[in-house]
Amino acid sequence: MSLLQSALDFLAGPGSLGGAAGRDQSDFVGQTVELGELRLRVRRVLAEGGFAFVYEAQDLGSGREYALKRLLSNEEEKNRAIIQEVCFLKKLSGHPNIVQFCSAASIGKEESDTGQAEFLLLTELCKGQLVEFLRRVECKGPLSCDSILKIFYQTCRAVQHMHRQKPPIIHRDLKVENLLLSNQGTIKLCDFGSATTISHYPDYSWSAQKRAMVEEEITRNTTPMYRTPEIVDLYSNFPIGEKQDIWALGCILYLLCFRQHPFEDGAKLRIVNGKYSIPVNDTRYTVFHDLIRGMLKVNPEERLSIAEVVRQLQEIAAARNVNPKAPITELLEQNGGYGNSGPSRAQPPSGGPVNSSGVLALAEYDQPYGGFLDILRGGTERLFTNLKDTSSKVIQSVANYAKGDLDISYITSRIAVMSFPAEGVESAIKNNIEDVRLFLDAKHPGHYAVYNLSPRIYRASKFHNRVTECGWAVRRAPHLHSLYTLCRSMHAWLREDHRNVCVVHCMDGRAASAVAVCAFLCFCRLFSTAEAAVYMFSMKRCPPGIWPSHKRYIEYVCDMVAEEPITPHSKPMLVKSVVMTPVPLFSKQRNGCRPFCEVYVGEERVTTTSQEYDRMKEFKIEDGKAVIPLGITVQGDVLTIIYHARSTLGGRLQAKMASMKMFQIQFHTGFVPRNATTVKFAKYDLDACDIQEKYPDLFQVNLEVEVEPRDRPSRDVPPWENTSLRGLNPKILFSNREEQQDILSKFGKPELPRQPGSTAQYDAEAGSPEAEITESDSPQSSSTDTNHFLHTLDWQEEKDPETGVDNTSPKESQSNLIADGDGSEVSDEEEASCPSEERKPGAGEDTPRLAAGTRQQDLIFDVGMLAAPQEPVQPEEGVDLLGLHSEGDLRPAAPLQASGVQSSNTDLLSSLLEPSDASQVGPPGDLLGGETPLLLASPVSLLGVQSNLQGKVPDTVDPFDQFLLPSSSDTQPCSKPDLFGEFLNSDSVASSTAFPSTHSAPPPSCSTAFLHLGDLPAEPNKVIASSSHPDLLGGWDTWAETALPGPASMPVPEGTLFSSAGHPAPPGPNPSQTKSQNPDPFADLSDLSSSLQGLPAGLPAGSFVGTSATTHKSNSSWQTTRPTAPGTSWPPQAKPAPRASEQLRSHFSVIGAREERGVRAPSFAQKPKVSENDFEDLLPNQGFSKSDKKGPKTMAEMRKQELARDTDPFKLKLLDWIEGKERNIRALLSTLHTVLWDGESRWTPVSMADLVTPEQVKKQYRRAVLVVHPDKATGQPYEQSAKMIFMELNDAWSEFENQGSRPLF
């Protein structure tokens, strides 16, 4: 990349910079960079390239401006190339025609925030590219011969300096775009990224492979138009060395003279043969004709050397009486000079220091390009307008800065934010500590206090000893007690006098200052969410660039001062493990990671899992998740940092290991609910993340935790324990009512919705008080299955009623308020974070909050135990039907009879998730009453429920009682295990009812002790079948009276069990009812008429009907019946009962013999439609589970399914087409017919056999281009499709040519 290659493209408007540069500008511009002894402030972006950005930076000490080149690299080869470029520039620096090297620095991937190695290269700042000056000058006429002489001579002097090195340095990328014009008007050569000291001498001994390798390397570092004949044709066996720079100089001289390149199209044949032409009628530049011919010789040995070129130029200059080393003032004069019009910034004298106290930063932003803007005068008003539009966006971020040259912003009239006030050597920069003191003393004499959040300190006497040193660590959120103490201290200072102001600063006045100010705004109840406060800070100063943990701690402050405050508890928390799902891709192969963890509590590191490299487990993407076991107990501010371990050869020899930070998480344990088992963090909740490609989709981090039941009081009393919230009022932030109304109109109504930076979701409409206090109707469950089920659910954080109690007296004493200002409550981990002076409190004001809104906790918790039920709710409309927004305690559930709630408004899901009281029996209103929550019960308990039918059908049929009905109070459990007693119980009688086949059937039920085998708990688990909800396994006669449309009814005597053949079955348990002991699982499936075609209608009670049980994909024990298929009625046909020997055969026919199938329907009749799942009900699971066929089975399918939601269907089709065939021209051509649009008939599919030789590939490629060329599809609906196909084929063809157009065999 060339230095300042596209600097002036910025003038075209704000859209000229790419997205990456725009993001980098917001992240890097404004920062302070230290390079050696220089401290630089990055001011703006000048240009961007493939992997580098160029900024304008200013030395804070001298005010001198530099060009700062920031190069990013993620490969070792690029690292070596960048280091070589720096070495060459450093070696060549000092020549008057080579850009001046100043300093350089680098950091590795592990230390960089971008996940790539970063290199900083500091050089002198030039005025611009020569090519841009030439374009403007040539609009008025051709260049003079003297100007060309100066430009070319100075360029050759720079090349001569390179060739004089030992060994000679070859630039290899000389072109007019790499020539800069300095502020003094001289030529500066730049961009040594392609330079080398290696020459090549090909001969007949070189193999084709070696020639191809050399050609590829040279092609990668040269520009096509400037390539020499020996490079284009390596088989000419000409030496490739310094003479290639002479050829490039000849092209530059030709371009300067005739305003066009001699090989404009880069045609190889013209270059190899040296076919260029000098205009015959040219008389202006005849003095250069021989020089051009001497430099553009095809044979490099015949070309002039750089010494000969310089000597001829000196002779020409002497003949024309021109000093070739003099500045090229003609370019500057014709372009408007250095700044001879308008109020543009004055150009400093050469080598002289810049007076930094002259103009305000606003003036610099108003004219950010200084005198260079003058060259745009005359006919370029549009460019100047775009420049002003671009500058206005920068001005917005500093529009509220104080007058003078200070970087200070007023968030409100009583809260100011500034950058670090410097002294000593840094006294020349903007925020000089003396200037800051004079400004504050003049504007707020004796009524300002300074809060220093940075770890650096200065003399507090500069600000009359009213300085609070907080000492917050960088790149992490502040400790909660320090943040809360700071808010109390600022509040006490503002209350002391209505003229008092708070001045907050960190190093740059961004992240740390934003956390302090936003937390204080929420502390004073101006806002109730972090997002609203951060938005106000961004508008009043600049985007703070804070991390998710910063927002999390601001949310903590919001919780602690809410209408119903949440006080952090003092219970220790056991962190069992850290689980990352899916596995992040941090290995070099991007297929997994080798993680280890460090945990800090406060400033102390309490544990690390780092071991020897080989002893740490490596997780692959196939593992699905990465688990780091911890097992440590923490309390307070917890910082968890996850690293990826890397091993290098040198590290192995020295027993060292390189680590790369993957992410970090910070939170406070006091806000983790007492019954939480998992703390979830999504990808956007993590701090210090690497590039997004390393984190798979839906990546999240789970902390498996357990909060201990007992409190562990800390050594120091937390500051929130003795704080009264009654005096908190947003009026204290403003000087008058008008200011408050203005802020309120801009930022307070309505409060801004939450952004993805915080997990807590914001509800735009505040919920009613009734909805907020609604709790669960179900008692607490202690079932382990319940815990397992709820572990997969995300619930709102449980609010403890204890946190709503105010432990302080209504009035706070003056001593307590004064204590806010001293350092008595500072913990051991923090620096003194309170003002040194004592402050007297002012009168408290009690007004409602500015903007109240419902809030949720910043973290998502998996609650292992559900909350207790709510008290009875009187109005029917307020009942929580689904129990999804409920919170609870440990109080027992009140009976529904006492609550007076109708059955239709009962919590419908509580019984699925909670057991009811064992002593009470639900009436018909208790729709899901049962002993054990069915969705959470184990398979044993599901099969152990009783199935006797007792009582009668309720008068009102509830639409939800298809799930289950409550057990009766007079049902007694069995005294001992009886596996089949319930099946043979003659008391099981079903009442007549209609059960539609489209409804879901109930879960199977049997005796209480079925499969318990005597060693399971004897708690009665009872579910009773009703007439509207028959029991499938409680007795086969239950289904007898179900009236369904279907085939003709089959008369059967009432009360008799029949086998599938129509004969009376022998006494004993039915084989279909005892499937667990029957060796033939298909013995009862011979009658397909009953299992596939539905149930006959009108059967009397007590008759036997074979039914089918459909096992759902969720592996639960629910059963359903198939709807009756319409068609010809099947008359009953007597079949012999199957013999036992046939049932016990290992190879039997599921369908049976022909004589067992009944009468076949005519072949011409309409056949029933059979799907792939229709026969699943014939084959039970037999203890095996089956995955969902409709769901994705691989990670690739999951990604495709996610991509298909918001991607164009044809683009998906195109992605499927190129998958596995990227840039493979043969594979793409052979499958082209699969991706063409409908109606395209010109393309004839070809096979791989038609694409063996390069000629065949070329022929088919041209045919394909004729079919899919976008020009032929203009205006057609498939125009976009043609473009995408054409681009893929074109890229594949280019790759095919680059690889040498090799045959297939």
Curated annotation (Swiss-Prot):
Protein EC: 2.7.11.1
Stretches assigned to the C2 tensin-type domain: 570-708
Domain of life: Eukaryota
Biological processes, Gene Ontology terms: clathrin coat assembly; clathrin coat disassembly; clathrin-dependent endocytosis; endoplasmic reticulum organization; epidermal cell differentiation; epithelial cell development; establishment of skin barrier; forebrain morphogenesis
Keywords annotated in UniProt: Acetylation, ATP-binding, Cell cycle, Cell junction, Cytoplasm, Cytoplasmic vesicle, Golgi apparatus, Kinase, Methylation, Nucleotide-binding, Phosphoprotein, Serine/threonine-protein kinase, Transferase
Gene Ontology cellular-component annotations: clathrin-coated vesicle; cytosol; focal adhesion; Golgi apparatus; intracellular membrane-bounded organelle; perinuclear region of cytoplasm; vesicle
Bias-annotated ranges (Acidic residues): 822-832
Record's catalysed reaction(s): L-seryl-[protein] + ATP = O-phospho-L-seryl-[protein] + ADP + H(+); L-threonyl-[protein] + ATP = O-phospho-L-threonyl-[protein] + ADP + H(+)
Domain Phosphatase tensin-type: 397-564
GO MF terms, alphabetically ordered: ATP binding; clathrin binding; cyclin binding; protein serine kinase activity; protein serine/threonine kinase activity
UniProt modified residues of type Omega-N-methylarginine: R1122
Cited InterPro entries: C2_domain_sf (IPR035892), DnaJ_domain (IPR001623), J_dom_sf (IPR036869), Kinase-like_dom_sf (IPR011009), Prot-tyrosine_phosphatase-like (IPR029021), Prot_kinase_dom (IPR000719), Ser/Thr_kinase_AS (IPR008271), Tensin_C2-dom (IPR014020)
Residues with Phosphothreonine modification: T774, T792
Annotated region (Disordered), positions in chain: 332-354, 747-856, 1044-1141
Biased composition (Polar residues): 776-789, 805-817, 1105-1131
Family statement drawn from the similarity comment of this UniProt entry: Belongs to the protein kinase superfamily. Ser/Thr protein kinase family.
Protein name: Cyclin-G-associated kinase
Organism: Rattus norvegicus
Lineage: Eukaryota, Metazoa, Chordata, Craniata, Vertebrata
